[in-house]
């Protein structure tokens, strides 16, 4: 080998916070008698009714503690306070459910009809930890998005440290998934049998140049552990754009993802990740609930 030969350089994005290995997502409805008042409080600072105000302070205190200790990964309401999405980082599903049951809003039936799933985030791949990141990067090398190297050649890794910043707008899309067909495709791939071209197109749609990950449209995306759902949180400017991205996914076009729901979502917990449009209101409300505000 030439003495002037230099190993290839591969850039690796390293975030300040890695997505936990296990996440449990909870969707719940908000009591229609409380939602409009909460909406006005966060939109214009209007005072809550006395009973709801005290309950809300206890709810915020409960969630703030869980956000600070890492038990809540991300949590918050829809834009109009009709439903919530809470994502817990706990050892198991039952632990996550116990934390929700202890929420003052849940105990007072302000939250109800809760549905649960274990959630595995696949993209953005650079926000995930091992072994998920290695699996996704292996897929990217297999389809030519990342380079492959001959035996004996190892790249020099150039690290790019990034701070993950919550965007101004987030839109949740929860779609049902055809777990049977997805499992069959995965089994065919493992057995080196022919796979549908739309599987590769789906990977390119998410991971390739101009795809949703590379363009920054994926805040966090991936399947439920049982493959019955796909939960995608889009970082885009409008719900129409989120809908278009979902509809452009080859898995949607081929019927593997279907019946999607959409809503704008605000992160309230943990406070350090709060959506920009809610940060000032949360700072004020959290401060009101403390003898010595943290902010």
Task: Report the location of each language-model feature.
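Conserved, structured core segments of small domains
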Residues: 2-295
């Amino acid at each position: 080998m030439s003495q002037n030969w230099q190993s290839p350089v591969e850039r690796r994005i390293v975030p300040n916070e890695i997505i936990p290995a296990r996440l449990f997502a909870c969707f719940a409805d908000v009591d229609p008698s409380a939602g409009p008042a909460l909406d006005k409080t966060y939109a214009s600072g209007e005072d809550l009714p006395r009973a709801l105000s005290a309950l809300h302070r206890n709810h915020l205190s409960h969630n703030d503690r869980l956000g600070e200790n890492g038990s809540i990964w991300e949590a918050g309401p829809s834009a109009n306070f009709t439903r919530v999405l809470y994502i817990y980082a706990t050892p198991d599903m039952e632990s996550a459910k116990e934390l929700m049951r202890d929420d003052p809003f849940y105990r007072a039936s302000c939250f109800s009809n809760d549905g649960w799933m274990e959630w595995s985030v696949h993209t953005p791949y650079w926000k995930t930890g091992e072994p998920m990141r290695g699996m996704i990067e292996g897929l990217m090398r297999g389809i030519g998005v990342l380079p492959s190297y001959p035996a004996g050649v190892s790249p020099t890794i150039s690290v790019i440290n990034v701070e993950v910043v919550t965007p101004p707008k987030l839109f949740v899309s929860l779609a049902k998934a055809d777990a049977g067909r997805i499992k069959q495709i995965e089994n065919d791939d493992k057995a080196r049998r022919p796979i549908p071209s739309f599987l590769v197109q789906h990977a390119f749609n998410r991971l390739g140049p101009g795809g949703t990950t590379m363009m920054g449209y994926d805040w966090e995306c991936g399947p439920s552990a049982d493959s019955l759902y796909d939960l995608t949180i889009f970082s885009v400017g409008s719900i129409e754009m989120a809908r278009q991205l979902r509809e452009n996914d080859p898995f949607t076009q081929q019927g593997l993802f279907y019946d999607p729901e959409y809503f704008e979502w605000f992160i309230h917990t943990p406070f350090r990740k709060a959506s920009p449009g809610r940060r000032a209101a949360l700072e004020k409300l959290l401060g009101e609930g403390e003898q010595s505000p943290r902010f």
